[in-house]
Swiss-Prot record:
Low complexity bias: start-end ranges: 556-574, 968-983
Protein name (database record): Ankyrin repeat and sterile alpha motif domain-containing protein 1B
Subunit and partners: Interacts with EPHA8. Isoform 2 interacts with COIL.
Organism: Mus musculus (Mouse)
Span of the annotated motif Nuclear localization signal: 934
GN (gene name): Anks1b
One Pfam family matching this protein: Ank_2
Domain SAM: 809-875, 883-948
Cellular location(s): Cytoplasm
Keywords carried by this UniProt record: ANK repeat, Cell projection, Cytoplasm, Nucleus, Phosphoprotein, Repeat, Synapse
Modification type Phosphothreonine: residues: T503, T772
Functional description taken from the UniProt entry: Isoform 2 may participate in the regulation of nucleoplasmic coilin protein interactions in neuronal and transformed cells.
GO cellular component: cytoplasm; dendritic spine; nucleus; postsynaptic density; Schaffer collateral - CA1 synapse
PANTHER family: ANKYRIN REPEAT AND STERILE ALPHA MOTIF DOMAIN-CONTAINING PROTEIN 1 (PTHR24174), ANKYRIN REPEAT AND STERILE ALPHA MOTIF DOMAIN-CONTAINING PROTEIN 1B (PTHR24174:SF3)
Modified residues (Phosphotyrosine): Y900, Y1006
């Protein structure tokens, strides 16, 4: 080694003495130590001494090495001997670049100030980066401060056109960003078309940096060729940044250079994050549209207040309205204050409830009494002309939902608790489904009802199913000029006003949970009402008795109403109905919450959760209402079966200011409404009516539909006629037209409870009502008809309620079903993917992930489909209710998949016992069933199976092919039966079974052992039996070099089962820089050192079971068998034994959430077991890789195993499994591993011993 190399090495290692010695001969002459001529000895020492600026092969000088390694004293010494600070290495880096990159502020100052050679702070490397770029990128704020003080130019851009501010924003260096924008605020306006600091920070999800940039004055809507910062945040799934940008007021409609908006980009990249971001965007767009509507309404309100002239009859109500308006104005101010200060939603609801109820109670009854019998003006009951209705619409402070909800809707927390978006519309034409408001009688009959009106509206809005509603008031063209109110659900009305904003597609977590939280604060009464419609009290206004029809369609509630044909009357009291479905749902939720926790200590296995797949977690369905079949039936039915009084319509009497009212005493009728769309007839809904008689039995509620009854009867396997008199009577009444979609029958017990409650209330109101003679005669006729058919109808409907079998004929096609829920555009999506029959699309068949996979990206539409599916019959699994098909053909015909019969038979699935053990992987790769709907139908029909029960294999096998092409299983060691690991538990019993199967497969009479049909025997004899196979490359061919030629296990072992090993879990370590096996070695050394520090630490080491399959590695607590975590095979990058202790091994996983790598370290019971685990991991990846290739070749890229569900644009990487020998051992130790089952070659057997290290690297 020459002196130059010695100097470089001394500078790198920090050997100050050696540097001093090597450079000491230069001191006197070079720095002018003497004035006379230099002695000859000194000149010779200079000639022989090292060059202080000498470089190595990378271009590093001694000063580079010292600056990079932080040797301050050597830097000073080198500068003292005139080392140059302005020599660049091969990549153009100067010593100041390296010091800044390292973050050593002292060395940076020395290089700048010490001399005699001074660093130039604006020097650039080959990538045009300055030292400020290096320091800013790695967040060295002290170095950045020094460089900025030295007037480093922060506008210099590197070869990627990035400034130091860009790099700091890109990597989230918050302090550096603050320092640079404080020193040079003009940098935020110096942007390129490629990027801006805001775009870079948004792309990587640095929320704090985004906020700092925006607060510093950066334009939130600045654009690049990729669009706005919102495009970047949405594309990379940064939900928090999207929220910040939207709150700042970014324009969500900006388009990128390709003309795409943010929503367009989200549609191109479907994922869970995309759905969340799309929901935020839609909420933002809806809020912006609503705010504009509020401003417009306020402007119209001012104009209307100046020009409107009220009649004398309206003046009393106007006085009261002004009083309420004054109080509500204070309330709205408090709501806005809540919004600004981000108060909790409970505080806001208390404000609404207390303020409104307290102030409305101040309105004295005397004031109402002064009105006499005059017709007063209210927002829902007054007889108004069309012009007056329009004026009233523009009053945002009225007692209706308009003013209150427009102020309340944007409040934080409203959407989370289930408040729908309410938008008021104005329609010039008559609606198809109006809620007709009848002319008002005297208001003094019920002076206290208005007090609860606002809360009733709030309660009603809150308790609807989670959907977006539109409440629209429209002028009525009827002769009595009564106003109309139509409340429609999306998808059911074709008259939506295009001026309203888009309806949010996201659904709140649970309507019943929201109701439970909200009713308590909005309506604090002794008896809380939990009805889905909150007991329709606001129609108890004596002047407003109309018929309500609550239709439940796919979880969304729509109110439609029509006048009922009945004689005039004064009032009828309303029956309260409690929603027991909500209480049941809450009970279900409580049961789930009360589930006992797992017994293992979470702290011991905390490291395993890094990079763990959420597959072990059971997702909690927020819609508890649809959790079980009973809830699925009862909840929606009770929403649609709310008991309401018989509607009475007051006949308008012209030329008479005071209508004459004659009291009658009718029997109160409880109505049960069933809806069924009939495409051949008009959408008539027939209402079955039961008379309430004291002392009579409490029968079931029932309903009939003349248009759809025969169809329903066919569904249930029986066709019968209905008495014509009953149909004619109901048709003549023309009660309502419904846009509802599904027949709903309540369960027997629930219906009887409801009937009992309603009968009690009806009997109490019977004495307070009278009937006119004509009305009496009509109902007497009804009574006779009811008595004649009562028993037959009830017994028949009891059979309907008890019927649980699958319908024998389809109720409707998929297209008709989708049209009924307002989503006909998805018919091709469902049909093309196997969801082609409504009978086989129940909740145990179709899931949200299925809809996402087939291309339904809109979360609101998926939610609507899933809620409608809850109302469809579930598939009947084999064995349910005695259903046991005797053959495969019979079973396939029963689920309408008879076309697959031949595929099942030729692949050996000849009996139902074999079918009950089939797995979805076999359906994809063996039976080639590519339609996900058909696969889900098959699995749902087979029912639930135990996970621990291995599937029975049909007479076919996935063979392991040797390089010679012979289709034989791997040759195992003859001493397999002797290699029993009593401690490790790794004896592979299925190997013996596999050998027997292989022998049978080689026997030409193999198929004679299995009972089969004539068709099967013919196919076996003619050679038509297809034997699908998966070919694994042997280890020595799949890797660069290895002494092993055969894998440890048969591939089916890793596909249908798993290989379980016991080991000790030592812990995990964060890998800052991924360096393959070096990283695993460092982690193993660190974990061993931690365990050796104390015996107490060793006692805490838990024992786990590693369950290895082609999907990945599951971690099972050996104590209680609970699954702790699961690492997918695609996230495992490297596995290796520790060279210092071969019984210790580790592998590296990637945590997808944090994007960090973690190394998990384990200790096996012996060296052999550690080697076997590492080899099994390599084989698991090879199996998964071959399965993925086979699935892709077969055109099933959308149905790959879950471990390979990557984006289609990325090719599947070829695995690099390297099992290499790194240590040669003494031949005397060769016999140690002679009996291992994976040792198959005697020649190779003698080449490996106990001290051999094997590594499996999987990338």
């Amino acid at each position: 080694m020459g002196k130059d190399q010695e100097l470089l090495e001394a500078a790198r290692t920090g050997n100050v003495a050696l540097v001093e010695k090597l450079l000491s001969g230069r001191k006197g002459g070079i720095l002018g130590g003497g004035s006379g001529p230099l002695p000859l000895s000194n000149l010779l020492s200079i000639w022989r001494g090292p060059n202080v600026n000498c470089t190595d092969s990378s271009g590093y000088t001694a000063l580079h090495h010292a600056a990079l390694n932080g040797h301050k004293d050597i830097v000073l010494k080198l500068l003292q001997y005139e080392a140059s600070t302005n020599v660049a290495d091969n990549k153009g880096y100067f010593p100041i670049h390296l010091a800044a990159w390292k973050g050593d502020v002292e060395i940076v100052k020395i290089l700048i100030h010490h001399g005699p050679s001074h660093s130039r702070v604006n020097e650039q490397n080959n990538e045009n980066e300055t030292a400020l770029h290096c320091a800013a990128q790695y967040g060295h704020s002290e170095v950045v401060a020094v460089l900025l003080e030295e007037l480093t130019d922060p506008t210099i851009r590197n070869s990627k056109l990035e400034t130091p501010l860009d790099l700091a924003a890109l990597y989230g260096r918050l302090r550096v960003v603050k320092m640079i924008i404080s020193a040079h605020p003009n940098l935020m306006s110096c942007n390129t078309r490629k990027h801006t600091p805001l775009h870079l920070a948004a792309r990587n999800g640095h929320k704090a940096v985004v906020q700092v940039l925006l607060e510093a004055g950066m334009d939130v809507s600045c654009q690049t060729e990729k669009g706005s910062a919102l495009h970047e945040a949405a594309l990379f799934g940064k939900v928090d940044v999207v929220r910040v940008l939207l709150e700042t007021g970014i324009d969500a409609n900006i388009k990128d250079s390709l003309g795409r908006t943010v929503l367009d980009i989200l549609k191109e990249h479907p994922s869970q994050k995309s759905l969340q971001i799309a929901t935020l965007l839609q909420d933002y767009l809806e809020g912006a549209g609503r705010s504009a509507a509020v401003l417009e309404e306020h402007a119209q309100e001012d104009t209307a207040q100046e020009t409107h002239l009220s009649s004398p009859a309206e003046s009393p109500q106007k006085t009261k309205s002004e009083t309420v308006t004054g109080e509500l104005s204070k309330l709205l101010d408090e709501i806005k204050l809540c919004q600004e200060k981000d108060y909790s939603f409970e505080d806001l609801c208390h404000t609404i409830s207390d303020h409104y109820l307290d102030n409305l109670s101040k309105i004295s009854e005397e004031e109402l009494g002064k009105n006499g019998s005059q017709s007063v003006r209210t927002s829902s009951t007054i007889n108004l002309s069309p012009g007056e209705v329009e004026d009233e619409e523009e009053d945002p402070n009225s007692c209706g939902p308009t003013g209150l909800w427009e102020a309340l809707t944007p409040c934080n927390g409203c959407r989370n608790l289930g408040f729908p978006m309410l938008a008021q519309e104005s329609y010039p034409k008559k609606r198809n489904f109006p809620m007709e408001m009848e002319p008002s009688a005297s208001l003094d009959t019920f002076p206290s009802e208005n007090e609860n009106f606002l809360c009733e509206l709030v309660d009603t809005a809150v308790t609807k199913k989670p959907c977006s509603l539109e409440i629209a008031r429209a002028p009525s063209p009827r002769t009595d000029n009564a106003s109309e109110v139509a409340i429609t659900a999306p998808g059911t009305s074709h008259h939506r006003n295009s001026s309203t904003g888009p309806t949010p597609d996201c659904s709140p977590p649970s309507p019943d949970t929201a109701l439970k939280n909200i009713v308590k604060v909005i309506r604090p009464q002794p008896k809380q009402r939990t009805s889905i419609v909150s007991s329709l009290d606001f129609q108890r206004m004596n002047h407003n008795q109309e018929y309500f029809e609550i239709s439940t369609s796919t979880g969304c509630t729509s109110f439609t109403s029509s006048p009922a044909a009945s004689p005039p009357t004064s009032s009828v009291e309303t029956t309260e109905v409690k929603n027991e479905g909500a209480e049941h749902a809450d009970d279900l939720s409580q049961q789930e919450d009360d589930e006992p926790p797992k017994e293992y200590d979470a702290g011991q296995f905390a490291g395993l959760l890094h990079g763990s797949s959420p597959a072990c977690e059971s997702p909690e369905n927020p819609f508890h209402l649809y959790g079980k079949r009973n809830t699925c039936e009862d909840g929606p039915d009770e929403a649609s079966l709310a008991n309401s009084p018989l509607p009475f319509k007051q006949t308008p009497i012209e030329n008479n200011p005071e209508p004459s009212v004659k009291k009658v005493k009718p029997k109160v009728v409880s109505r049960t409404i069933f809806h069924k769309r009939n495409h051949q007839l008009e959408n008539h809904t027939i209402v079955g009516t039961r008379m309430s008689r004291s002392g009579s039995r409490n029968g079931d509620q029932w309903g009939v539909n003349p248009g759809g009854f025969v169809e329903r009867a066919c569904t249930l396997g029986r066709i019968r006629s209905l008495p014509k008199a009953l149909i004619d009577m109901h048709l003549s009444k023309n009660v309502s037209k419904s846009d509802s979609d599904l027949i709903a029958y309540p369960s027997k017990d629930k219906a009887r409870v409801n009937w009992s409650k309603s009968s009690t209330a009806e009997r109490s109101s019977k004495d307070n009502s009278e009937r006119t003679p004509s009305f009496t005669s009509e109902w007497e006729e009804i009574d006779k008809i009811m008595n004649s058919i009562d028993v037959g109808i009830n017994s028949e409907l009891e059979g309907m309620n008890g019927e649980t079998t699958r319908p024998r004929c389809p109720v409707q096609t998929v297209g008709q079903w989708l049209e009924s829920i307002g989503l006909p555009q998805y018919e091709n999506h469902l049909m093309a993917n196997g969801f082609d029959s409504v009978q086989f699309m129940g909740s145990n068949v179709m899931e949200d992930q299925d809809l996402l996979e087939i291309g339904i990206l809109n979360s609101g539409h998926r939610q609507r489909i899933l809620q409608a599916i809850q109302l469809l019959p579930k598939m009947r699994p084999i064995g349910h209710d005695g259903y046991h098909p005797t053959s495969v053909a019979e079973w396939l015909d029963s689920i309408e998949l008879g076309d697959y019969t031949k595929a099942f038979l030729i692949n050996g699935y000849t009996s139902m016992d074999l079918l009950k053990k089939i797995w979805e992987l076999e359906l994809i790769n063996v039976l080639k069933i590519s339609l996900i709907g058909h696969r889900k139908r098959i699995l749902a029909s087979l029912g639930d199976r135990l996970h621990d029960d291995p599937p029975q294999k049909p007479p076919r096998s996935i063979t392991l092919r040797e390089p010679s092409g012979n289709h034989t299983p791997p040759q195992l060691s003859p001493s397999l039966s002797q290699s029993t690991y009593t401690t490790g538990g790794s004896l592979d019993v299925p190997h013996i079974i596999m050998q027997g199967d292989a022998r049978r497969r080689r026997n030409e009479n193999y198929f004679d052992d299995i009972p089969r049909s004539k068709l099967e025997r013919q196919m076996a004899q003619t050679g038509d039996w297809g034997e699908p196979s998966i070919t694994l490359r042997p280890p020595n061919e799949a890797t660069a070099s290895t002494p092993v030629q055969y894998w440890q296990h048969h591939p089916e072992k890793l596909i249908f089962q798993s290989c379980d090993y016991k080991a000790f879990y030592l812990g995990s370590m964060l890998i800052k820089e991924l360096r393959g096996t070096e990283s695993t070695q460092d982690a193993c050394a660190k974990m061993r050192a931690n365990c050796r520090k104390s015996t107490e630490q060793m006692k805490k080491v838990p024992t786990i079971i590693l369950s290895v399959s082609y999907k990945g590695v599951k971690f099972i607590d050996a104590a209680n068998k609970n699954i702790i975590a699961e690492h997918e095979i695609r996230n495992i990058s490297c596995a290796a034994q520790d060279p210092e202790d071969l019984s210790t091994f580790a592998y590296i996983t990637k945590d997808l959430k944090s994007n960090h790598h973690y190394c998990h370290v384990f200790t096996a019971f012996d060296v052999n077991l550690a080697y076997e685990i590492i080899l099994t991991l390599g084989q698991a990846f090879e199996v998964a890789y071959q399965l993925a290739l086979q699935a892709r070749k077969g055109g099933h890229s959308s149905t790959l195993p879950e471990s390979f569900e990557n984006k289609p644009s990325k090719p599947i990487p070829k695995p690099r499994v390297s099992i290499r020998k790194s240590v040669q051992i003494d031949p005397s130790e060769q016999k140690t591993l002679a009996n291992l089952p994976w040792i198959v070659e005697p020649g190779q057997e003698a080449k490996r011993g106990i001290n051999t290290k094997y590594e499996t690297t999987i990338f």
